From Swiss-Prot:
Residue sites binding ATP per the record: 112-118
One GO MF term attached to the UniProt entry: UDP-N-acetylmuramoylalanine-D-glutamate ligase activity
Family, similarity comment: Belongs to the MurCDEF family.
EC number, as in UniProt: 6.3.2.9
Gene Ontology CC annotation, any one: cytoplasm
Biological process per Gene Ontology, one example term: regulation of cell shape
Keyword Chaperone: no
Name of the protein this chain belongs to: UDP-N-acetylmuramoylalanine--D-glutamate ligase
Main subcellular location: cytoplasm
UniProt KW Amino-acid biosynthesis keyword: no
Source organism (scientific name): Shigella flexneri
Intracellular or extracellular location(s): Cytoplasm
Superkingdom of the organism of origin: Bacteria
Enzymatic reactions: UDP-N-acetyl-alpha-D-muramoyl-L-alanine + D-glutamate + ATP = UDP-N-acetyl-alpha-D-muramoyl-L-alanyl-D-glutamate + ADP + phosphate + H(+)
Lineage of the organism: Bacteria, Pseudomonadati, Pseudomonadota, Gammaproteobacteria, Enterobacterales
Length: 438
C-alpha cells in the first residue's frame, strides 16, 4: 500500500476514470487538484466542492508544483507539459498504477489491438461460473479503482497501450497480448514498434504470459521463455482442431469443447475462447466451469452482433471494429452465400487500409464507404465501391439491392468520432436502420 499523505497530487482528465481517482485520494485524506483540457468535461458536476479545478487547458504551474501527476490515458506522455514535468523528476502515473499498488487479489491482465473486451468479459464469466468473487473492468466497464474491494478474490482487467505506458507495478498472475496491428498511429509517431513496446509492458513481472503463436509481435522482446503459454488457429498449446467438418478447441492435444456448443461464432471468437481458457487455467480456475461459461456466453453488443435476420439476409453490427485489424478479423474466414455488402468508414486515425484488399476480391463484394476517410476506403476497390457522406445514406443506397443469402456487415475499420459520439451510438444507429430497411 502506498502512502500519499502530504503529497501534492494533480489529476489530469475527468470523466469516470478521473472521478475514480479523485475519490481514491479523498478516501486517503488527500485532496487532489484536477485539470482537463475540455471546458466542461464529463463528471464536472460530480466533483466535490473542496477539489480545485482548472478547465479548458492544462495548468503548467500546478503541474510543476506537483509531487505526483495522475494522467488520463487520453493525454499523450509526449505532451510538452508532461514532458517538462517528467524532466523535472515529477512522478507521472495512471489510474491502473494506483490500482496495482493497492490490489490484494491476483490480477489477470489483457491487452491487444482487437478482441480484448470479449476476452476480458469471458474470463470474468468463467470466474463467476466457478463461484469466484471477481472484479472486471479497466478499459471497459468500471474504472479499475472502482473495483478495489477487500472481498474480491480475482481481478480481470482490460488494459490499453495508453494505460500500460503509465503502469509499472503490475504483477499479473496471467497476462496476454492478443495481437498487435496498427491502431492509434496518431499517438505513436515512431510507428508499430513503439505501440508494441507499450503493450509489452504487460508481461513485466507476470507469472504466465499467454502469447499468440500466429503473431510474433505478441512475444516478449527476448522471445518466448518458460513463462509463455501459446494459442493459435492451427498451432500453439491452445489451438483449433478441424475434423470431419467440425471444429474443436484443443489444449495440448486434448479436445476440450466442440465449438457448436458455443453461442459465439466466427473464427476470431473461437481464438478468443482459447485465450480466455488459457488465462482462466493460469489463474487456477477449474476447467469444467470455464468450459460451461463458454457454452452460455452470447458475446458483447457491437462485436459481430447479428441484429437482424430477415428474408434470408443477415445484418451484422461490428461497430466495435474501430481499426483495420478488427475488420480483418471479421472478414477472415467469413462465409457468405450471396453478396457481402460491407460498410466502411469514419476516422481512420492515420492507418494504412491496404491489408483489407486481400479480403475484398471476387464478384460477391460491394463496398459502401462513408465519413472522413470514405474516399481512401473506396479506393481499395473502386469498381465495386460507392461513397456517401453518412452511414445512413449508405444503408439507404444498399437496402434495395440486397437478395436472400446476402450479408450486410458494418465493420468500419475506423473510429466513429467524426460523425458519432462513440462506436456504440454508431452501432445502435446501424441496428435501428437495419430493422427499418431489412
Amino acid at each position: 500500500m502506498a502512502d500519499y499523505q502530504g503529497k501534492n497530487v494533480v489529476i489530469i482528465g475527468l470523466g469516470l476514470t478521473g472521478l475514480s481517482c479523485v475519490d481514491f485520494f479523498l478516501a486517503r485524506g488527500v485532496t487532489p487538484r484536477v485539470m482537463d483540457t475540455r471546458m466542461t468535461p464529463p463528471g464536472l458536476d460530480k466533483l466535490p466542492e473542496a477539489v480545485e479545478r482548472h478547465t479548458g487547458s492544462l495548468n503548467d504551474e500546478w503541474l510543476m508544483a506537483a509531487d505526483l501527476i495522475v494522467a488520463s490515458p487520453g493525454i499523450a506522455l509526449a505532451h510538452p507539459s508532461l514532458s517538462a514535468a517528467a524532466d523535472a523528476g515529477i512522478e507521472i502515473v495512471g489510474d491502473i498504477e494506483l490500482f496495482c499498488r493497492e490490489a490484494q487479489a491476483p490480477i489477470v491482465a489483457i491487452t491487444g489491438s482487437n478482441g480484448k473486451s470479449t476476452v476480458t468479459t469471458l474470463v470474468g464469466e468463467m470466474a463467476k461460473a466457478a463461484g469466484v468473487n471477481v472484479g472486471v473492468g479497466g478499459n471497459i466497464g468500471l474504472p479499475a479503482l472502482m473495483l478495489l474491494d477487500d472481498e474480491c478474490e480475482l481481478y480481470v482487467l482490460e488494459l490499453s497501450s495508453f494505460q500500460l505506458e503509465t503502469t509499472s507495478s503490475l504483477q499479473a498472475v496471467a497476462a496476454t497480448i492478443l495481437n498487435v496491428t496498427e491502431d492509434h498511429m496518431d499517438r505513436y509517431p515512431f510507428g508499430l514498434q513503439q505501440y508494441r513496446a507499450a503493450k509489452l509492458r504487460i508481461y513485466e513481472n507476470a507469472k504466465v504470459c499467454v502469447v499468440n503463436a500466429d503473431d510474433a509481435l505478441t512475444m516478449p522482446i527476448r522471445g518466448a521463455d518458460e513463462r509463455c503459454v501459446s494459442f493459435g488457429v492451427n498451432m500453439g498449446d491452445y489451438h483449433l482442431n478441424h475434423q470431419q467438418g467440425e471444429t474443436w478447441l484443443r489444449v495440448k492435444g486434448e479436445k476440450v469443447l466442440n465449438v457448436k456448443e458455443m453461442k459465439l461464432s466466427g473464427q476470431h471468437n473461437y481464438t478468443n475462447a482459447l485465450v480466455a481458457l488459457a488465462l482462466a487455467d493460469a489463474a487456477g480456475l477449474p476447467r469444467a466451469s470455464s468450459l460451461k461459461a463458454l457454452t452460455t456466453f452470447t458475446g458483447l453488443p457491437h462485436r459481430f452482433e447479428v441484429v437482424l435476420e430477415h428474408n434470408g439476409v443477415r445484418w451484422i453490427n461490428d461497430s466495435k471494429a474501430t481499426n483495420v485489424g478488427s475488420t480483418e478479423a471479421a472478414l477472415n474466414g467469413l462465409h457468405v452465400d450471396g453478396t457481402l455488402h460491407l460498410l466502411l468508414g469514419g476516422d481512420g486515425k492515420s492507418a494504412d487500409f491496404s491489408p483489407l484488399v486481400r479480403y475484398l476480391n471476387g464478384d460477391n463484394v460491394r463496398l459502401y464507404c462513408f465519413g472522413r476517410d470514405g474516399a481512401q476506403l473506396a479506393a481499395l476497390r473502386p469498381e465495386v465501391a460507392e461513397q456517401t457522406e453518412t452511414m445512413e445514406q449508405a444503408m439507404r443506397l444498399l437496402a434495395p439491392r440486397v437478395q436472400p443469402g446476402d450479408m450486410v456487415l458494418l465493420s468500419p475499420a475506423c473510429a466513429s468520432l467524426d460523425q458519432f459520439k462513440n462506436f456504440e451510438q454508431r452501432g445502435n444507429e446501424f441496428a435501428r436502420l437495419a430493422k427499418e430497411l431489412g
